[in-house]
Amino acid sequence: MNTALNYQPEVLVDTADLSREEWLDYRRLGIGGSDAAAIMGLSPFATIRDLYFDKIGVTPVIEEEEENWVAKEVGHRLEDLVAMIFAKKTGLEVFPVRKMFRHPLYPFMLADVDYFIRFPDGSIGILECKTCNYNAKDKWADDGIPENYVLQVRHYLAVMNMNKAYIACLYGNNENEFVYRCLERDRMEEEELIEQEKYFWEEYVEKKIEPPYSGKPDLILASIRKYKGYADKSIPEISISSLESRSLEKYLKLSEEKSQLEKRKKGD
């Protein structure tokens, strides 16, 4: 794998004046930072099959209403505030660059970074801005960082050829309900991520081959429903793969066990 450090990211497009749909079209030209967790099977929101369908432009059979659309919208609108709080707490200069970048050695790797940081020595790093509800703050306990965010930022560091990033998260309505973590570049972790992303792009997306499902059973079931529709006994049966069948059976079994545990708990 070519992981030489003497490269500069390419600018794919200036995003300042892009519409939402135009921006999404450019994102489909490659893999973005927020896609990394799905490829690694660690996304809390989507399976690798969902990501594949999005990249090749498959329209869902059922457009399900996003349960967390408000949280996503709040997170987007508060990015500037998160950056402002981070700058105030650290004294570091932060600034946006409204461009989508591309890795020159792996052109399927894209990066649309929230903010950049200028450190006192003149070097540049990355700032990723997040929000979460108060109950989710425990995911940041003991200097922790949610794994999907770690993968997102490692992807960005690789594309931008930078060595340090901060991830900042606001979980309340004042600046004291705020955490930030530093993430240094890790070449071994980066190489593994690039290898997995390369395989996904070249073996699945470019060849139009559906990747096998993996990850949480509830996400798999939601994905099957989204792209194959609800069951209708009046129409012919559809076929699913053996892996999909096992995942569905596992999900149903776990759901039943959870239901039984909740019943016993209420009876105690």
Regions found by a protein language model. Name each.
Residues 1-268:
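Accessory terminal regions of nucleic-acid processing enzymes
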